[in-house]
Amino acid sequence: MIELVTDSPHPIHLVDSLQNPKLFASLSTDFPLIFITNTKLNTLILPPLLDLARSLGFSVETLTIPEGEETKTGDTFLSLHQQLTDLNVPRQATLIGVGGGVILDIAGFVAATHCRGMPFIAIPTTLVAMIDASIGGKNGINLNHIKNRIGSFYLPKAVWICPRKLSFLPQQELHHGIAECIKHAYIADSAILPLLQDPNALKKEDKLSLLIKKNCLCKASVVQQDVRDYAKRQILNFGHTLGHALEMLFIGKIPHSCAISVGMVLETKLSLSLGVARSPAILHSLIQDLLRYQLPVSLKDLYMRAQIPPHNCDQILSALTYDKKKQNTPLPPFVMIEEIGLAASFDGRFCQTISKHILTKVLEEEFYAMHNN
């Protein structure tokens, strides 16, 4: 089965198996396929895919990098370029990224820049990659722990999503992807939330596939209205402004999803402080939805998980100044929620600059609660 979920802003296919020759039908055997993956997936998922490609007449090469966010660096990026150069790969070759968000970010950036652009196919193997990282063409690498400081917009030729590959993941890893599902529900599509009410239901393939499909459609719909991230696509940054600042400070001690979960809670508190959110019930609902999947909802939760001494308010404010969305203002703009399923439009900007005083107040209340509860 190959189901076209959407073809805009690029084709996204939901498949029941990657061992389907029809997936490769649009590719020419005149040019090689270059698979980029990590060392673990190179033995776990890739071999049958390589065998199929070879049986169809393709010449294939595999480039592997270590696992983890710490791999998302300029050194890794340049090493992959050097390997492609050593292989003398033509620009008509297709790069295929197989992995989670880190792999797809790096592989997509390499595809965008090698020989000024090569065809790229994404095969996401984590939930967060299936519903988020593989969609929309954003790619890049970190610089000095600053998230995605260097990167580009480069739409893939296709995305192939096989939900069955999630069976390789521990439940905790699956829950990490739920954070992005919850984000989509709160910014644009509240109809996603009923699919998340029973974590056990997601053990069923049909329920999980439906969740993936709805989230792909949600993100694709937002992106196709604003591919270059000047207006509505900004809403996908909900939770990520403070979340990325926290990731920068924690330096690999917490998963991306945990930082984003707390970021969403704090940014919803900002929405309430400024009178943008229409009811405190939004915050209560968000916290319950995150807790259902054992995701953190406070700074205290993060520090307990990371087992490191707390930072202070000034350190978080300083980290925010490196946010790539920051303009000629002390702080970057924030996405805010009006009601569940609706991000505030702010006259078409979809994000709002706030005063340092307001943010400091929210953060200080969070630190006070952490030290006194």
Swiss-Prot record:
Binds 1 divalent metal cation per subunit. Can use either Co(2+) or Zn(2+). It comes from the Bacteria. Its cofactor is NAD(+); Co(2+); Zn(2+). It is found in: Cytoplasm. GO terms for molecular function: 3-dehydroquinate synthase activity; metal ion binding; nucleotide binding. It is an enzyme of class 4 (lyase). Its EC number is 4.2.3.4. It holds the Pfam family DHQS_C. GO terms for biological process: amino acid biosynthetic process; aromatic amino acid family biosynthetic process; chorismate biosynthetic process. It catalyses: 7-phospho-2-dehydro-3-deoxy-D-arabino-heptonate = 3-dehydroquinate + phosphate. Disulfide bonds: none annotated. InterPro entries: Dehydroquinate_synthase, DHQ_synth_AroB, DHQ_synth_fam, DHQS/DOIS_N, DHQS_C. Keywords: Amino-acid biosynthesis, Aromatic amino acid biosynthesis, Cobalt, Cytoplasm, Lyase, Metal-binding, NAD, Nucleotide-binding, Zinc. Belongs to the sugar phosphate cyclases superfamily. Dehydroquinate synthase family. Catalyzes the conversion of 3-deoxy-D-arabino-heptulosonate 7-phosphate (DAHP) to dehydroquinate (DHQ). NCBIfam families: aroB (TIGR01357). This is 3-dehydroquinate synthase.
